[in-house]
Amino acid sequence: MLRLCIALSALTAVSWAQSCGIPASEAKDFLAVHNKLRASISAGTYVAKGRKMPAAKTPIQPMTWDCAIEKSAQAVANTCVFAHSQGRQNLGENLYTMWSSNKVSFTGMGKKASDSWEKEFQDFGWSDVKLTPTGFSSGIGHATQMAWAKSTKLGCGMKLCDGDKKVLVVCQYRDA
């Protein structure tokens, strides 16, 4: 029953995504993918590399959108530099970029970026619900940021760069 409540609260959190700058639909997409992943790991229903992964030892709460974190992430995205920012003050961070020979837009970027980070679990799985340096360096660093149980606040920024032929997405995470 508790797992059902967590899954329902994850879906509810999506409807409360209030963006401060990026399109609200993209903020909702970021939260939807993050919270779906978190709910399935919490419930023990997540499948990676063809096997059902163990449930989290404690319930994983859904993430909520944070406008101050969005503002911080947007400042990083505005640099158009694909590199982790310095001085994040206890914020986790994920980066995503996409190039094209044609102009790109923000449409669908919340889902595309989040899906690409979550795919690390699909590609590499994990051996233990407790993150170790070995586990982190196995290629799941972005996905673990999405699933980190103590992180409950999310904010993302996006910037079109290089004549609108590249988009840089930055998401930052804060512990409760």
Sequence positions of predicted segments:
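Mature extracellular or exoplasmic CAP/SCP-family domains and secreted bioactive peptides
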Residues: R3, V14-A176
